[in-house]
Amino acid sequence: MRLSSTNMQARKMLFAAILSICASSSKKISIYNEEMIVALCFIGFIIFSWKSLGKTFKVTLDGRIQAIQEESQQFPNPNEVVPPESNEQQRLLRISLRICGTVVESLPMARCAPKCEKTVQALLCRNLNVKSATLPNATSSRRIRLQDDIAIKMHVLVGKRFCPWCSSKAERVEFIRESLVVLRMVWVGDSLKNKELE
């Protein structure tokens, strides 16, 4: 019954709109220009959407309103009185968390971790200091050992090369040139060392 009454009202409104368009037209023609066509199409679209999509929009909006109401009911109301059971549960939860923290802190690994970290840092620093202190001595001792080896080998080779029956004159000259090159390299290394010390 209600739907039939709304249909009758819509038809009356549409008929009134058509009559007003006819009355406003200069030549008493129902559809005269583009503006009238657009207005008539717009009125028809409104009536069609209201008839066909009105219930869908209403159901969607009702469902959304109900979902919002359910979500708002899940949040606690600040004006609502909290029951003593929930206060007791929160107190027990805080106590259990505090006990867990003390148990973890009392474990041997938890107690030893900071001490082990400090010990490892101290050991690494000491090793670095020892290596940095012994590095110049090691390089200088290696350089001295290298010079001694070169000198010993030079004496042996010179003794062998300068034997009158072991080598010819050309071989002796070539050996002297090689020896001068080696001595020049040693001299350059010593001069660089002196500059570093200065």
Swiss-Prot record:
Question: Which processes are annotated in GO (biological process)?
Answer: proton motive force-driven ATP synthesis
**Per the UniProt record, which residue ranges are transmembrane?**
29-49
Q: Its membrane topology, per UniProt?
A: Single-pass membrane protein
Q: What is its main location?
A: mitochondrion
- Example GO molecular function term? proton transmembrane transporter activity
* Gene Ontology cellular component list: mitochondrial membrane; proton-transporting ATP synthase complex
Query: What are the record keywords, sorted?
Result: ATP synthesis, CF(0), Hydrogen ion transport, Ion transport, Membrane, Mitochondrion, Transmembrane, Transmembrane helix, Transport
On whether Transmembrane is a keyword of this UniProt record, the answer is yes
The record's InterPro entries line, in alphabetical order, gives: ATP_synth_Bsub_B/MI25, MI25_plants
Where does the UniProt annotation locate this protein? Mitochondrion membrane
Q: Which PANTHER family match?
A: ATP SYNTHASE PROTEIN MI25 (PTHR37774:SF4), ATP SYNTHASE PROTEIN MI25-RELATED (PTHR37774)
Q: What does this protein do?
A: This is one of the chains of the nonenzymatic component (CF(0) subunit) of the mitochondrial ATPase complex.
Q: Which family does it belong to?
A: Belongs to the ATPase protein MI25 family.
User: What does the annotation say about its assembly with partners?
Assistant: F-type ATPases have 2 components, CF(1) - the catalytic core - and CF(0) - the membrane proton channel. CF(1) has five subunits: alpha(3), beta(3), gamma(1), delta(1), epsilon(1). CF(0) has three main subunits: a, b and c.
Its name, as the record gives it, is ATP synthase protein MI25
Which species? Nicotiana tabacum (Common tobacco)
Q: What is the lineage of its organism?
A: Eukaryota, Viridiplantae, Streptophyta, Embryophyta, Tracheophyta
